[in-house]
Curated annotation (Swiss-Prot):
This is ATP synthase subunit alpha. Belongs to the ATPase alpha/beta chains family. The record marks 373 as: Required for activity. The gene is atpA. Signal peptide: none annotated. It comes from Pectobacterium atrosepticum (strain SCRI 1043 / ATCC BAA-672) (Erwinia carotovora subsp. atroseptica).
Length: 513
């Protein structure tokens, strides 16, 4: 075989022309220590605060401490097989989670991966877990209500769209029950819901998901889960991931509701991470920035104006405001609301619903203490009918508590005092409500009207519950159109007042309970 030099040179030229060199510059570092989910890395000179660091085995860590000679990072997931000397790389990316309508009805972990066995997620893109809250100019005042379906909350501690209302109380006082019922009540309101479970047992979360499914509310809800068995890093980041998913709807001119259950466990997870990173401890061993931990999260819940929505959607959505309403939950120890984390969150939020174990154990459920529960901005969002009828309830309860304390020492009470005590007891009984039984605005209004106008005076205390159930069944059967009209408009006028009087007079004259 004879080789032609011309052919060889042509072949070499062709190969040289086709030769393509792709060079990638990686900022690479070396793990120098691994302990309790924290790694220290040497050599990552260009790493950003909060950047994802690529680890062997398709895992990531997040850079939290940038020091002179090393980087302290928290591992997202299992870390038992990581060892000193392993190579890691910068990614140049901040942690992002999938967002979109495809997440509704799904259960996901902190990183947005589905854990409900229903297949891959259908998402609309990714969003950074850490985002700057809307500015002052981009916001709009709260003037539309979020109905929880609880008489005691909607009447005395109303919540508006875009508000942050803290639910605070000891363990086993009905905090999660109140939040779950608020989600169930949004089935037909158009409000999308996000439930973030932090540091809870997997069995508890499974029960919550099942209840949401049973009541037809799961298809409207995203459940974000960081169980007690997961790393502190995932528990710390879960609320931010859930918030990013909720902001997707807010920024597109829709309304969303997010529940953080609960932020006490998130603060404990953050304290654990901070101590392992050797940050100096402060009060109750929490780091100095634990206030900022919660403020930067809760400030993202807001009502944004139409200009913000139009600018965000590049003109696709016009004339619509968006909102993200937050119901953070805080667990107290022995009713101590003056502890570090509870006082922080109380000062950040727009009011609090305080649930008391004494009331809960006495059978008053929801165990709301109306004396120290408050809504700072929700009053402006109340429907006209609720605002008109709820004023007397708070006053009646305040007078009842004062007289009840006084009557323990006074043996002889006059008729007016006895009447007030009896009225207060009946109002307290009337505000009791079973779990998973939220009430519409019209139903609540009719019941409050009956209490305020003295229709309970001749009803025995033990019969108040059956009186209410019979009244609502009668009104629904005979005056369904009126109730629907009130639910749609929330209006209150002389005509509606007259109709309510007619309903109650006829009911008391013709029905038994």
């Amino acid at each position: 075989m004879q080789l032609n030099s011309t052919e060889i040179s042509e072949l070499i030229k062709q190969r040289i022309a086709q030769f393509n060199v792709v060079s990638e510059a990686h900022n690479e570092g070396t793990i120098v220590s691994v302990s309790d989910g924290i790694i220290r890395v040497h050599g990552l000179a260009d790493v950003m605060q909060g950047e994802m660091i690529s680890l062997p085995g398709n895992r990531y860590a997040i850079a939290l401490n940038l020091e002179r000679d090393s980087v302290g990072a928290v591992v997202m997931g299992p870390y038992a097989d990581l060892a000193e000397g392993m190579k890691v790389k910068c990614t140049g990316r901040i942690l992002e989670v999938p967002v979109g309508r495809g997440l509704l009805g799904r259960v996901v972990n902190t990183l947005g991966a589905p854990i409900d066995g229903k297949g891959a997620l259908d998402h609309d893109g990714f969003s950074a877990v850490e985002a700057i809250a809307p500015g002052v100019i981009e916001r709009q005042s709260v003037d539309e209500p979020v109905q929880t379906g609880y008489k005691s909350v909607d009447a005395m501690i109303p919540i508006g769209r875009g508000q942050r209302e803290l639910i605070i109380g000891d363990r086993q006082t009905g905090k999660t029950a109140l939040a779950i019922d608020a989600i169930i009540n949004q089935r037909d309101s158009g409000i999308k819901c996000v439930y973030v479970a932090i540091g809870q047992k997997a069995s508890t979360i499974s029960n919550v998901v099942r209840k949401l499914e049973e009541h037809g509310a799961l298809e409207n809800t995203i459940v974000v889960v960081a169980t007690a068995s997961e790393s502190a890093a995932l528990q710390y980041l879960a609320p931010y991931a859930g918030c990013a998913m909720g902001e997707y709807f807010r920024d597109r001119g829709e309304d969303a509701l997010i529940i953080y259950d609960d932020l006490s466990k998130q603060a404990v997870a953050y304290r654990q991470i901070s101590l392992l990173l050797r940050r100096p401890p402060g009060r109750e061993a929490y780091p100095g920035d634990v206030f900022y931990l919660h403020s930067r999260l809760l400030e993202r819940a807001s009502r944004v104006n139409a200009d913000y929505v139009e600018a965000f959607t590049k003109g696709e959505v016009k004339g619509k405001t968006g909102s993200l309403t937050a119901l953070p939950i805080i667990e107290t120890q022995a009713g101590d609301v003056s502890a570090f984390v509870p006082t922080n969150v109380i000062s950040i939020t727009d009011g609090q619903i305080f649930l008391e174990s004494n009331l809960f154990n006495a059978g008053i459920r929801p165990a709301v203490n109306p004396g120290i529960s408050v809504s700072r901005v929700g009053g402006a969002a109340q429907t006209k009918i609720m605002k008109k009828l709820s004023g007397g309830i708070r006053t009646a309860l305040a007078q009842y508590r004062e007289l009840a304390a006084f009557s323990q020492f006074a043996s002889d009470l006059d008729d007016a005092t006895r009447k007030q005590l009896s009225h207060g007891q009946k109002v307290t009984e009337l505000l009791k409500q079973k779990q998973y039984a939220p009430m519409s605005v019209a139903q609540q209004s009719l019941v409050l009207f009956a209490a305020e106008r003295g229709y309970l005076e001749d009803v025995d205390l033990s019969k108040v519950g059956s009186f209410e159930a019979a009244l609502l069944a009668y009104a629904d059967r005979e005056h369904g159109e009126l109730l629907q009209q009130i639910d749609q408009t929330g209006a209150y006028n002389d005509e509606i007042e007259g109709k309510f009087k007619g309903i109650l007079d006829t009911f008391k004259a013709t029905q038994s309970w």
